[in-house]
Design a protein with these regions (language model features):
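Exposed boundary/loop context
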Residues: 6, 17, 62-63
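Bacterial N-terminal signal peptides that target proteins for export
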Residues: 2-10
């Protein structure tokens, strides 16, 4: 969301807004930046070995691949693509998390719903909740597939801001829902010393009615929202999961009213947090985190917060998962334009979901081109990531590859 829009949303309070109200605000803003017409009529010729960006991608059943905000893993000789099963109308989750399979990353078979919503009233994943950004990883120790995703409880808008866990013995499911929770309740970031903790405890988020001032930002950087949510746990919205070279897994999420990123270490079974975490870019308004590691260097690509509307991507780099993280210019470059002539400084009309690495000779930036009027018809964008002479990621538009 833009600064003005997000300010209005936050001042009202997530708990006071319905999902429809919040999504309507985002849709109104998005409509001023990009035209969302009816469903695209062109389809990508991916069945003959080409992926065409900015067009519908059909599975072998002839239907558009309805898997958004997710990721791809390889198990055996098969790739599995997980993502949000989005409705054609509305914004809540009515089905669950989709899964597709492929031998070549071109021809995709619809394997159905890997994790279904519950029909039980009061369940955390009751039909009508919001399930977003699902990420599935394989745990070599437990020999199970673990799914983490952003969960909002039914009827509570975006107030819950939880991370949820599920697991399965099979890559296509069914996944068993385990629980949902806030992140790292009652725990300080591991690198936050006693003095900084005392400073954070002197802040008062409820006292700030005037957002976005210099004084307010200073309070945010002191840890105002970290302290506000300290007892109940930190918020978790857009998220990803990263497994490092040593097998350690990390949860990276947009927290503190989408103002700050958190990176948290997961337990060996990937089903809980160890309690070790820290913050990235406090007050920076980053979401949709995507991460990769190249030659010992970590690269984190995020978007800004503009609802469904595209914006300029942000990039951070570090030599350790724990930082310090340095912000660099957006990796998206070039004069070519993407979907509906969106330029590089609008991420070619898309928002990142995952970086698929170790499959092709180059990492692939996976993204969604959102269509909030028909979310099920949101398009997929895959772009190869190059590296310049200094070893910095560079992403250019390509029509197909």
């Amino acid at each position: 969301m833009t600064t003005k829009l997000l300010k209005n949303f936050l001042l009202c309070g997530a708990a006071m807004l319905s999902v429809a109200q919040m999504q309507g605000m985002a849709l109104e803003q998005a409509g001023t930046n990009v035209s969302y017409g009816e469903h695209p009529t062109a389809v990508a010729d991916n069945q003959t070995g080409e992926l065409v960006n900015g067009q519908l991608w059909l599975a072998t059943d002839g239907e558009h691949i309805n898997a958004h905000g997710g990721n791809i893993i390889k198990y055996g000789d098969t790739y599995y693509w997980y993502g949000e099963n989005r409705p054609n109308r509305g914004f809540t989750t009515e089905m669950g998390v989709s899964v597709y399979s492929s031998k070549d990353l071109k021809s995709w078979k619809n394997e159905g719903v890997a994790l279904s919503v519950s029909e039980e009233a009061g369940s955390d994943i009751e039909r009508g909740c919001i399930m977003e950004r699902p990420k599935v990883v394989y745990n070599k120790k437990t020999k199970k597939f673990v799914m983490l995703f952003h969960l909002e409880l039914k009827g509570r808008g975006y107030e819950a801001a939880r991370v949820a866990f599920a697991e399965s013995k099979s890559p296509v499911g069914p996944f068993r829902f385990i629980r949902s929770t806030r992140v790292n309740a009652g725990i300080w970031p591991f690198d936050m010393d006693k003095k900084a903790q005392e400073v954070a405890q002197q802040t008062d988020a409820a006292a700030w009615k005037d957002w976005w001032s210099k004084e307010w930002r200073v309070e945010v950087e002191k840890g105002m929202y970290l302290w506000r949510d300290f007892k109940g746990g930190q918020m978790s919205r857009d998220m990803t999961v990263f497994i490092d070279d040593d097998g350690k897994a990390y949860h990276i999420t947009s927290s503190q009213e989408n103002l700050t990123l958190l990176v948290s270490e997961l337990t060996d079974d990937f089903l809980d947090f160890t309690g070790k975490y820290n913050v990235i870019a406090p007050g920076g308004q980053n979401e949709a985190p995507c991460i990769m590691k190249r030659n010992g260097t970590y690269w984190l690509i995020c978007s800004g917060c503009t609802g469904w509307a595209p914006n300029e991507a942000r990039m951070f780099t570090a030599q350790s998962i724990w930082g310090p993280w340095k912000q660099l210019p957006s990796p998206f470059v070039g004069e070519a334009t993407g979907y509906q002539n969106m330029p590089a400084n609008k991420t070619f009309g898309a928002q990142g979901t995952y970086i698929l690495d170790g499959v092709f000779d180059k990492p692939i930036f996976m993204a969604d081109i959102w269509n909030p009027r028909h979310l099920s018809q949101s398009l997929h964008l895959w772009l190869p990531i190059d590296f310049n002479a200094e070893g910095v990621p560079v992403i250019r538009w390509v029509d197909k590859w």
